[in-house]
Amino acid sequence: MPEWSVSETATEEELAVLSEGVLRVGRALAANGNARPLACFLRDRGSIIAGGSGRTEFDRLFVQYLWVAEEHRCCGLGSEVLARLEAEARKRGSKDALIETLSDRVAALYGRLGYKPVATIPRYVGGFTRHIMVKALEE
C-alpha cells in the first residue's frame, strides 16, 4: 500500500526523482525545444567584472543572470551586457527577451531599456516585488 511522508530532510536521491521526473515531462512537452546556452562576460585584467547568462529557446531569450561588480555599477555596463545578449539572441532568431528581478530600481532600468512588465508579484519574498518583464527584439 502506498505510504505518504513529509520531510525537512529529503535525500539528494529522493529530490533527484522529482527533478528528473519534471524534466522528463517538460522535455516531452517541448519536443521541438532548441535550447542553446548564452553568456557574455567583461573582464578586466583577467577578472570578470560584468556579465550575463541564460539561453535562447522557442524564439525567446531567457536571461537568467545579469551581474556587475559593485565598484563598476552605474556606468552602463549592465545595459551593455543586455545589449550584447540581445544582439546574439537576434542572430539566433529570437523574437523577444524575458528577464526577472526583485529590485524595483533594476526593473525601472529594464523599463528604460524597452522591457515591459508582464507580471508583478508583490511581497514575493522578504517584502520584495518580483518583476517579470519582456522586450520585443524584432525591429
Language model regions located:
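Conserved N-terminal entry element of GNAT/NAT acetyltransferase domains
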Residues: 1-10, 139
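Conserved active-site tyrosine of GNAT-family acetyltransferases
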Residues: 18, 110, 115
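Conserved beta-hairpin
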Residues: 35-50
